[in-house]
Every structure is written in structure tokens, then in C-alpha cells.
Amino acid sequence: MSAIPTQHGSGPAWKSGQIARLGTALDSLCGALVAIDKQYGEIIALRRAVCESARALGKRRPHMTEVAHLLEATFALTAPAHLSMARRLAVEMRCILEQAIARLRELPDADTSRESSCRIVGSAMADLVHHCDENAVALSKLLGNAEHEIQVLQALFVELSGP
């Protein structure tokens, strides 16, 4: 969600530009929501597979039973709540963007012809897009961390499943 320069001006074209700007941010946010859901599911499935592999290995090597218990306890304490919280915040941001777009659409074109109205609304839109950009950076980092966790879990699963 990179910032699109604030459009100056007034009238219906200005209003359309603001709506397009918010629509771009909304599309990006929806893509992040899909990625969060995918990674959350992947992490849960991999954690389950790692625990099952560790338990199976514990049957052949009794000392690995303790490792299985440790993994289960660690996973229980470190549930991917960070992804759940990020998803909730992203859903809230999506609602805010959808409301902003709806309000802009309801704004009479006559009101967009006044420079003072455009300046006030434009300033609010710039703040909103700025916060969207900040959230996008945070979501990108979070998704990167989730991807790293997935890679570590995959490697651990392979290690535990080996001979």
C-alpha cells in the first residue's frame, strides 16, 4: 500500500481520485487478509504434523517423548495469536476504508467543488492512507515472520520424519 500523492483540486474528478486511492489501499489490505489466513492455516497444520512426528519418534526413541511434550507445550504457549490479532486489525481497517469510500461516494459533487471542503477531506484522506501504509509495513513484517516460522516448522518436520 504505497502512498499515492494527494491529488489537489476539486470537483467530481477529485472525488473519483480519492475513491480510487482508497480502493487501491483496500485491495492491498484484502490481499494481506488472504495471506494471513493462508499462513495461519499452514502454521497450525505444520505444528500439528511436527507434534505427531515427535510423538511417533518418541515411541521408537523414548528420550524423544520429552521433546514431543516440550514442543506441544511450546506450541500451546505460542499459538499464532499474532496472526489472529493482525487479522482482526486488518478487518477493522478494511471496514474503515469501506466506510470512507462509501462516505466519499455519498458526498455531493457540489460539495467537492469548494476548495475548503476538498482541503479538509483531502487532509483526512492523506492521514488515512498514511496509516494504511504504516499498517502495510507492519503486516509485511508479520507475514515475513510467519513465513520464517513455516520454513522452520517444515525443516523440523523433515528432521523428525527422517530415519
What role is predicted for each listed range?
Residues 3-163:
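Long, low-complexity or tandemly repetitive, helically biased scaffold regions used
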